[in-house]
């Protein structure tokens, strides 16, 4: 393999302007480009993993549900941070419009997702899901009693581990 180098007017060789030419005399395989080195890891590994990956409970002002006060008895394992949720299922565009109509009711929910859908769904439909999370079950019930949900939207309630 031969490399052409172009000479500049000041008799300097530019290494950025190169071209690869395959010749019959050169039977060597092409060499791989040099790999970039990753920057050194700055994570302090002396700390236990729980300190690295768990949130500081002092920063989280929401009431966390613990395994002792978990109300979902059908589950065998109950996480320490469980939130009541509502899944709103329906046509994606109507769910998007519903999300905008629910903005004045921000005090009735903790957070609301964008419209999403399951990727493994083989139905090839335009149905989507919006997930609404709450701090308490009372807040969830107040949301469902106050907000008017269109009849084309299906409502599913449950719990989500956060």
UniProtKB/Swiss-Prot annotation:
Pfam families (UniProt xref): PPV_E2_C
Coiled-coil portions: none
Domain of life: Viruses
Annotated stretches, region: Disordered: 15-47
Subcellular location: Host nucleus
GO cellular component: host cell nucleus
Keywords of the record: Host nucleus
BP GO terms, sorted: regulation of DNA replication
Keyword Lipoprotein listed: no
Bias (Polar residues): 15-24
InterPro entries assigned: E2/EBNA1_C_sf, Nucleotide-bd_a/b_plait_sf, Papillomavirus_E2_C
GO molecular function terms listed in the Swiss-Prot or TrEMBL record: DNA binding; DNA-binding transcription factor activity
Similarity section: Belongs to the papillomaviridae E8^E2C protein family.
Functional note: Plays a role in limiting the replication of viral DNA in keratinocytes. Recruits the host NCoR/SMRT complex to viral replication foci to mediate repression of both viral replication and transcription.
Protein name from the UniProt record: Protein E8^E2C
